């Protein structure tokens, strides 16, 4: 049934690339491409990349997690870029800005241009999204309400997930 992504720009830069709209996934693509919102230079080694957006996903009316996966264009003959953790797994309760850990495996810096898409979002369970809803920057939206998981990034809970006691 219905799977939807909700993308909210959190900076003025992101607003330029994500105008409020509802996009119907007519081609039934599994992944939702995500833009870089500014020009970047990725140095050799580990780089942290801000995406300037918050994202939520729901399936059948219930909030669900999603994955961040590299697009095939991220690693080419001209540039050797990978996501540091292979696939980013975003918990349903995470309500903060999306960020990437990208490793430049090359010996030289790599230029990334604004509006270039390096990654895509895939809904938990690999459900094909029906709609991508782009929200206004300061819009109050229930799926971004504070949660116990919150906005902490990159393993910030310091706990071992469902196995903790």
Swiss-Prot record:
Catalyzed reactions: dUTP + H2O = dUMP + diphosphate + H(+)
Cellular component, GO, one term: host cell cytoplasm
Protein name per Swiss-Prot or TrEMBL: Deoxyuridine 5'-triphosphate nucleotidohydrolase
Cofactor needs: Mg(2+)
Induction: Expressed in the early phase of the viral replicative cycle.
Keyword field contains Cell membrane: no
Disulfide bonds: none
Matching InterPro entries: dUTPase-like, dUTPase-like_sf, dUTPase_trimeric
The organism's taxonomic lineage, starting at the top: Viruses, Varidnaviria, Bamfordvirae, Nucleocytoviricota, Pokkesviricetes
Subunit structure: Homotrimer.
Pfam families (UniProt xref): dUTPase (PF00692)
Entry's family note: Belongs to the dUTPase family.
Enzyme class label: hydrolase
Protein localization: Host cytoplasm; Virion
Primary residence: host cell
Role, per record: The viral dUTPase may play a role in lowering the dUTP concentration in natural infections to minimize misincorporation of deoxyuridine into the viral DNA and ensure the fidelity of genome replication.
UniProt cross-references to CDD domains, sorted A to Z: trimeric_dUTPase (cd07557)
GO biological process annotation, one example: nucleotide metabolic process
């Amino acid at each position: 049934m219905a799977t939807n992504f909700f993308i909210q720009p959190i900076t003025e830069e992101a607003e330029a690339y994500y105008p409020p709209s509802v996009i119907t996934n007519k081609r039934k693509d599994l992944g939702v491409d995500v833009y870089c919102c500014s020009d970047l230079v990725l140095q050799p080694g580990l780089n942290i990349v801000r995406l300037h957006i918050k994202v939520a996903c729901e399936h059948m009316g219930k909030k669900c997690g999603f994955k961040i996966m590299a697009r095939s264009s991220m690693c080419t003959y001209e540039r050797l870029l990978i996501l540091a953790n292979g696939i980013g797994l975003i918990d349903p309760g995470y309500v903060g800005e999306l960020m990437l850990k990208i490793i430049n495996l090359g010996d030289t810096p790599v230029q990334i241009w604004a509006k270039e898409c390096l990654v895509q979002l895939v809904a938990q369970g690999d459900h094909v999204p029906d709609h991508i809803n782009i929200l206004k920057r300061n819009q109050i939206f229930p799926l971004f309400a504070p949660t116990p998981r919150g906005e902490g990034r990159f393993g910030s809970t310091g706990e071992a997930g469902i196995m903790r006691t």
